[in-house]
Amino acid sequence: VVALAGVMLALFNLLADIGIGPAVIQNKTLTAEDMNSINTFNSYQGLVLGVAFFFSAPFIAEYYGNPQVKLVCQIMSVNILMGCVNAVPNNILYRQQRFKLITIISLCSQFIAGAIAISMAFHGCGPISLVLPSAIISIPTMFVLRYITKVHFVWRIDWAPLKRIFSFSVFQFLANVVGYFSRN
């Protein structure tokens, strides 16, 4: 069930990853205000894709002929949203070469998610125990990343920084598309 939903999740994650992360790492001229605009754009994109994945869940379940896929996809839609919301702060840490901190955040998140998953599995939650913990843990991770990087949402997106990184991010996105379809 999770593997079936994972196939569609990979496609939506491909659309979510338009090369902004590597562009944030590569472009050293981006200011804090630029990062806030890029982060807000990426978050809105994640919201649109997450909602689209959520409402596509019944059709995905019908396509696979497995009604359990619906709930799994709906829970995974949170991962799409949070992946986009956390992308810029996470890549700022990569840009700053704070690998130890990235590892600590990742290990703590995975440990907590693993403990939740094991507990859910022991309580008979089935395939939900594989997907719900990562959705749950992504929310506090967002707050930790925001606190550390000081990235925040802005009401008005400045399109100039997005235009500056576009030439790099579009080729990164195209490379990801080629890689995705060569593997699938």
PLM features: residue spans?
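Alpha-helical transmembrane segments of multi-pass membrane proteins
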Residues: L11-L15, V51, F55, N66-I92, ...
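Interfacial helix-capping/hinge residues at the ends of transmembrane alpha-helices
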Residues: G21-P22, A57, N90-Y94, A117, ...
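Membrane-water interface segments that mark the loop-to-transmembrane alpha-helix transition
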Residues: L4-P58, L71-S77, K100-L101, S106
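Membrane-interface helix-loop junctions in multi-pass transport and translocation proteins
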Residues: V1-A3, P58, E62, K70, ...
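Primarily residues marking transmembrane-helix entry/exit sites
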Residues: D34-M35, V69, P127, P161-S169
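Membrane-interface junctions at transmembrane-helix termini in multi-pass inner-membrane proteins
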Residues: A23-A32, M82-I105, I128, T149, ...
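Interhelical loop/hinge segments that connect adjacent transmembrane helices in multipass membrane
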Residues: K100, F143-N184
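Membrane-water interface at transmembrane helix exits
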Residues: I25, A57, A61-E62, Y94, ...
